Amino acid sequence: MPETPRLLFVHAHPDDESLSNGATIAHYAARGAQVHVVTCTLGEEGEVIGDRWAQLAVDHADQLGGYRIGELTAALQRLGVDAPIYLGGAGRWRDSGMAGTEQRGRRRFVDADDREAVGALVAIIRELRPHVVVTYDPDGGYGHPDHVQAHVVTTAAVAAAGSVGDCDYPGDPWVVPKFYWTILGLSAFLAGRQALTPDDLLPEWVLPPEDIPFIYPDERIDAVVTGDSDARAAKIAALAAHATQVTVGPSGRACALSNNMALPILADEHYLLVAGRAGARDERGWETDLLAGLGFTGFGT
């Protein structure tokens, strides 16, 4: 019986998996791959959209994190993933908040003991034995401290998981064949932005600038996963499940966070390969399957 491919995505907060990799997760899950998502915090510091759940926020009841467990569970189900996995267990590390916000000092993820956090992820990697691991680039995508910390922890854990000499961590060593950063590709973003019309937006939304600093030029991209109509629909449904944090527009072609900046909901999701050997590439020089070169068939886009 052929081996089932396994992919692991590591994210900082609930909703990050759907925003960054929703189409990719849905694509592989629908084709029978084992897909897991590790979330490092409960997202307690998130800014709540609207009035219905506003009293859950950190400055009021401080119950947002628990509520977002339900949102993440629903989102993952819509993407085809069974249940969330929280690094260290649900609530072990707290959302650190955006850079420059008040430091509440209660088990913040950025203050996590490196060996404990890395060890928790090593244990997951050695148990699940993923063929592909995905997390953020060194800047955490857009610079959120928890995203940066997720990058640091994941990078260290991928290295330690395959080390035969490091016996302090549980489980048998597992060398991750391919390790990617999730990135935002320039051409796809600009095309998605340009395609948005007033019918796609809510009245209070504004379009993002064209020169967002954390976008990657096409020549730096190593891989793209293009979600089909089912994967894109699953991504939209998953984003809608994160209703305290994300609003999906009337057409399903755009969404916005609490800052009311409209973002195109892209079916193309881009990656940079940072460890492992690339598989077949297309005429752009991009892989179209994160599993390319690993001997699996039927998973490309």
Swiss-Prot record:
Record-listed E.C. numbers: 3.5.1.103
Reaction catalysis annotation: 1D-myo-inositol 2-acetamido-2-deoxy-alpha-D-glucopyranoside + H2O = 1D-myo-inositol 2-amino-2-deoxy-alpha-D-glucopyranoside + acetate
Cofactor field: Zn(2+)
Enzyme class: hydrolase
Assigned keywords, A-Z: Hydrolase, Metal-binding, Zinc
One example GO MF annotation: zinc ion binding
Binding residues for Zn(2+): 13, 16, 147
Keyword flag Zinc: yes
Pfam families, sorted: PIG-L (PF02585)
Biological process per Gene Ontology, one example term: mycothiol biosynthetic process
InterPro entries with a match to the protein in the record: GlcNAc_PI_deacetylase-related (IPR003737), LmbE-like_dom_sf (IPR024078), Mycothiol_biosynthesis_MshB (IPR017810)
Membrane-spanning parts: none
Family indicated by similarity: Belongs to the MshB deacetylase family.
Described function: Catalyzes the deacetylation of 1D-myo-inositol 2-acetamido-2-deoxy-alpha-D-glucopyranoside (GlcNAc-Ins) in the mycothiol biosynthesis pathway.
Protein name: 1D-myo-inositol 2-acetamido-2-deoxy-alpha-D-glucopyranoside deacetylase
Gene (UniProt): mshB
